[in-house]
Swiss-Prot record:
Coiled coil: none annotated. This is Small ribosomal subunit protein uS7. GO terms for cellular component: small ribosomal subunit. It comes from the Archaea. The modification N-acetylserine is found at residue 2. Part of the 30S ribosomal subunit. The gene is rps7. Keywords: Acetylation, Ribonucleoprotein, Ribosomal protein, RNA-binding, rRNA-binding. One of the primary rRNA binding proteins, it binds directly to 16S rRNA where it nucleates assembly of the head domain of the 30S subunit. Is located at the subunit interface close to the decoding center. Residues 1-25 are annotated as: Disordered.
Amino acid sequence: MSAEDTPEADADAAEESEPETARAKLFGEWDITDIEYSDPSTERYITVTPIAHTMGRHADKQFKKSEISIVERLINRLMQTDENTGKKQLATSIVTEAFELVHERTDENPIQVLVSAVENSAPREETVRLKYGGISVPKAVDVAPQRRVDQALKFLAEGVYGGSFKTTTTAAEALAQQLIGAANDDVQTYAVNQKEEKERVAAAAR
């Protein structure tokens, strides 16, 4: 074999390894390609990767959370209660089971359902309190895209907690209900209802 053949072999190996990376799936099951975004303003802040645990790599870096997978951010949100603090393996199993339920009930990629749920649960307006001469006055303001995603994840996690606390509904079932309802923009879903309420209050404060 001549020396000229060696670079071609390396190139072939590189071409073979590239599709392997592209075919990596979340939890070894869900395809992350072909995810569609309906809201251009939040698209760059909803990251989808096949990695669901980055071990706090960006914990001390401001705004770097947008580079973390939206699935991991949802898992982290589910840990933010007294009972679940630090229990990432439990939160991950809840999300994994919920994704299975979402796929069974909708026959869709649960990652796509999650992305749609976040977009539909993200408030566009909210209120801040301004003081004029010692009097607090509510003022409507636009919500930054990154905060919109943060608020959507918060509402989804709160909906799961409320839907599974002291009931026979499991956390995974509650999460599946929240994701499907929010993806369908159902106002009966807690996350969408909270978004509508925030926007209603902001509209009254214009």
